[in-house]
């Protein structure tokens, strides 16, 4: 897209209606008012105006010559027939005329005693006119990107096209990277759930997103550092094992070896193992949902994890000049036990909660029950700073004005999949092709493409 076009895409002066959920587009749609005046213009000018208005909404990202090849002058429609009417009549009454005696005779032949003739019965299903003009852009509804936008999996037709091009869409179980693919009745298309959550969810604040990215990078760096330290420790253990094997194979007892160094290395290794177990236990406490820690305890637990990591680094030094003593390990163990909640304390807390629930009145119990049900329903929708959209997830602003699904699509929002049931058709009084324009505008647009179809 050209940079110049970005400023005119949602022009508040010309007010073009676009296939997006943008707030400026909603403003243009709400303030559009009545249709532009076409009286006083030539027929060519009327058709040109209608074409420019409708093409801004229907397939505006598709080239004009490509749409001209897709255009079809056949407008699909169906007629609702009344079963009672079809069972009573066979259609001959529609062709009955004066020869059958069903029409009234001329006024000069009537007499005073003559009764009025029987009137021809019309089909009740044809009382409402069928808007054939609204089906002008029906061929575009078969496109994969337009179907994704109609199924509410994307906030605009261009975003739906981007999903297809980036390989986030499958048709009948196979990846489809062509946004212009024409769906057939019965085709199943599915979009990646994360892409749909990002496209239809509320955007995250830029400051929060930057902070989340910084925290994620820091966490990845810490994990990489821990993996490197574990790898170094394993390499040291392997070297010590090889040295011991070589010494045992030699079988030479030239001198009595001083075992103080080996004892020191063994003690350092034992303390390192204790520290690693402490670190695992601290991580278990932080990640376990059964340990309900307050904010201050969480801060203390983070500081403790940093101290344990620092002690591990000191214990892993080969020279052994600075090694943690047993007192450090004991102090860290005692501090960790203070932070953790023992099972007996957890049982006591549960019993206290039960006693408190007995003391609550009926209204408070109902409120508490609703809160618990809400938490159970939104258990999976938790705060996740790593996501690029707002968490807990909520729909995009101003989405309700565009939240409708055509009848020719069967959508399952849980798995972000939809079935293209059939081609859209026009019925008496309604059209299955969504359009913000009146039949008059669509009729003029149809006449514009009629000589080119």
Swiss-Prot record:
PANTHER family: 30S 40S RIBOSOMAL PROTEIN (PTHR11831), SMALL RIBOSOMAL SUBUNIT PROTEIN US4M (PTHR11831:SF4). GO terms for molecular function: rRNA binding; structural constituent of ribosome. One of its GO terms (cellular component) is mitochondrial small ribosomal subunit. This is Small ribosomal subunit protein uS4m. Keywords: Mitochondrion, Ribonucleoprotein, Ribosomal protein, RNA-binding, rRNA-binding. Gene3D superfamilies: RNA-binding S4 domain (3.10.290.10). InterPro entries: Ribosomal_uS4, Ribosomal_uS4_CS, S4_RNA-bd, S4_RNA-bd_sf. Residues 94-115, 221-259 are annotated as: Disordered. One of its GO terms (biological process) is ribosomal small subunit biogenesis. It is found in: Mitochondrion. Residues 222-243 have a biased composition (Acidic residues). Belongs to the universal ribosomal protein uS4 family. Component of the mitochondrial ribosome (mitoribosome), a dedicated translation machinery responsible for the synthesis of mitochondrial genome-encoded proteins, including at least some of the essential transmembrane subunits of the mitochondrial respiratory chain. The mitoribosomes are attached to the mitochondrial inner membrane and translation products are cotranslationally integrated into the membrane. Component of the mitochondrial small ribosomal subunit (mt-SSU). Mature N.crassa 74S mitochondrial ribosomes consist of a small (37S) and a large (54S) subunit. The 37S small subunit contains a 16S ribosomal RNA (16S mt-rRNA) and 32 different proteins. The 54S large subunit contains a 23S rRNA (23S mt-rRNA) and 42 different proteins. uS3m, uS4m and uS5m form the narrow entry site of the mRNA channel. It holds the Pfam family S4. It comes from Neurospora crassa (strain ATCC 24698 / 74-OR23-1A / CBS 708.71 / DSM 1257 / FGSC 987).
